[in-house]
Curated annotation (Swiss-Prot):
This is Vimentin-type intermediate filament-associated coiled-coil protein. It is found in: Cytoplasm. One of its GO terms (cellular component) is cytoplasm. Residues 129-166 are annotated as: Disordered. It comes from Bos taurus. Transmembrane segments: none annotated.
Length: 166
């Protein structure tokens, strides 16, 4: 085995040096890529933590809102129950007052004729009974008697008295 010629050794050394440079360059690029990947992984991990924390906070906020809405619903349902009870009570009162209202309406409709009747009765009361000297001979002792003709055994007739009590 003979020694290789010096040119071949120089070329081989140059080639080895180029391979070493390329290997060092690739290792540096690999290191840079690994650093970049680690940095991205850390950023993604932080971002995931932030998103997870935000999601947890949203869940808690949703739960608080649901609890508040449930409380509001219970309060509203209690108010509805109370109002329904008040309506039932008022309906019952209206049912009790309705016949009286109808009676009052009937009285109001009949008031003018009753007022006329009361005025006539007051006039009759003002006139009073006839004096005994003005009576017709052979007639009853009092011209205004309470006799209906059905009281055959009754010898005594009661005089009519006009009153305005209603």
């Amino acid at each position: 085995m003979s020694a290789p010629p010096p040119l071949q050794i120089r070329e081989a050394n140059a080639h080895l040096a180029a391979v070493h440079r390329r290997a060092a360059e690739l290792e540096a690029r690999l290191e840079a890529a690994e650093c970049m990947v680690r940095a991205q992984a850390e950023r993604l991990a932080r971002h995931d933590q932030q998103l997870s924390a935000a999601l947890d906070e949203l869940g808690r906020a949703k739960d608080r809102e649901i609890a508040a809405l449930r409380e509001q619903l219970l309060t509203s349902e209690a108010a509805v129950q109370s109002l329904q009870a008040a309506v039932r009570q008022r309906d019952k009162l209206i049912g009790q007052l309705q016949p009286r209202a109808e009676l009052l309406q009937d009285l109001c409709r009949r008031r003018p004729p009753l007022a006329g009747l009361l005025a006539t009765l007051a006039e009759a009361e003002r006139l009073g009974p006839l004096p005994a000297s003005d009576l017709l001979p052979g007639g009853p002792s009092s011209p205004l008697a309470n006799s209906t003709g059905e009281e055959e055994g009754s010898d005594q007739l009661e005089p009519a008295v006009f009153g305005t009590t209603v």
